[in-house]
């Protein structure tokens, strides 16, 4: 990410003004859409959860909607980059990558079924483990095996990477052995005592109540992060405006009937709310904070190089702070007008 990307956030997060003001013109509407689904669980579990939702979307839009699965988050990002994925459910970190590298744009946000404004990253151990808190974990880490998340996962990688590791000046490589996997795989590995500790999140643990209740009973949460914003729904910017309008209308109105509410509840959600690329600002700040920590602790860099890199990162953080201040001011004015 660079300063140009940050500077353009406030504009790219909204619909193109030039598009809104330009004369109407004929567009070729997409005849089918591929919906990317990140691999938080096995495809076997995800497919029945998502099929009713995608079928409803297909009926509303009047075009075929195909589920697009990949073995990791990067597969969905790359799919969008090469126009193989049209819409996708991402975590915040993978959405940031899609926006920056794959011509993506956030337009909606998930809301937890209980109405929570987001979810939490957690560290889990087996219920029989003597480890009960973060201090226990840090003290014994060199003797433990660690199940880290997908490198593009917000709750499985970025958030614990900052709050657990960077803030305590340690690394995931400090463990006896570290492996990377999705949330479901990590949870089952801890339940089966194949790894000692792993990352996860509260949404996925809730899903285990249905998909693997006996395994859930084997888990113990030893750390919980600050709140993470709800997951973004992202489309390709170069979709036709006609298709975007239909997609947006579907998401903003879905979940009003008992049948639709039941479909969303199976996914762990309540009705969606509107969003934009601006919801990624806190995640951008977190990624930059983590990068700053890494530069400062890098023994391979001389002091001059460290200063240059940290100065560049700080400039990006300052840009994001100014953007946040502007958004807060705009929000205050909007509330005053109302």
Curated annotation (Swiss-Prot):
Cell location: Periplasm
InterPro entries referenced in this protein's UniProt entry, alphabetically: PhnD, Phosphnate-bd
Cross-referenced Pfam families: Phosphonate-bd
Cross-referenced CDD domains: PBP2_PnhD (cd13575)
Residues in the signal sequence: 1-26
Keywords: Periplasm, Phosphonate transport, Signal, Transport
GO cellular component, one term: ATP-binding cassette (ABC) transporter complex
One of the protein's GO biological processes: organic phosphonate transport
Further facts: The sequence shown is that of strain K12.
The protein's role, per its UniProt record: Phosphonate binding protein that is part of the phosphonate uptake system. Exhibits high affinity for 2-aminoethylphosphonate, and somewhat less affinity to ethylphosphonate, methylphosphonate, phosphonoacetate and phenylphosphonate.
Assembly and binders: The complex is composed of two ATP-binding proteins (PhnC), two transmembrane proteins (PhnE) and a solute-binding protein (PhnD).
Family statement drawn from the similarity comment of this UniProt entry: Belongs to the phosphate/phosphite/phosphonate binding protein family.
Protein name in UniProt: Phosphonates-binding periplasmic protein
Gene name as annotated: phnD
